[in-house]
């Protein structure tokens, strides 16, 4: 059975939220690619649309949009997802995962593309800040 940690990014505020999904909610992500848009019901955002922006497997290998399927592939990278060079011209062979989500993926990164007030929809409103404003 699939189980994922989903990191939800709100581009309007710059905040991120984490949710654990399993069972039927996790099955909605299986077989989807980076860039696919789906309904936010799986992560508790019923009136929102989310887009898959990336992820990583249980060993920390990043998913890359330019690698097809769910396979692992060794790439000689000059930069980008999976490698940040420390000097100009540096290249390194890195193992990355394909763009399709399967059971080996541990974390999925998503971004909200349609909808507003993600914090309120997830029930993570800042109650302490509201109390401070009233005083």
Swiss-Prot record:
Residue ranges that the Swiss-Prot or TrEMBL entry lists as coiled coil: none
GO molecular function: structural constituent of ribosome
GO cellular component annotations of the record: ribonucleoprotein complex; ribosome
GO terms of biological process kind: translation
Pfam family, one: Ribosomal_S6e
Keywords: Ribonucleoprotein, Ribosomal protein
NCBIfam families: PRK04290.1-3
Similarity comment: family membership: Belongs to the eukaryotic ribosomal protein eS6 family.
Protein name: Small ribosomal subunit protein eS6
Source organism of the structure: Halorubrum lacusprofundi (strain ATCC 49239 / DSM 5036 / JCM 8891 / ACAM 34)
Lineage, opening ranks: Archaea, Methanobacteriati, Methanobacteriota, Stenosarchaea group, Halobacteria
Gene coding for it: rps6e
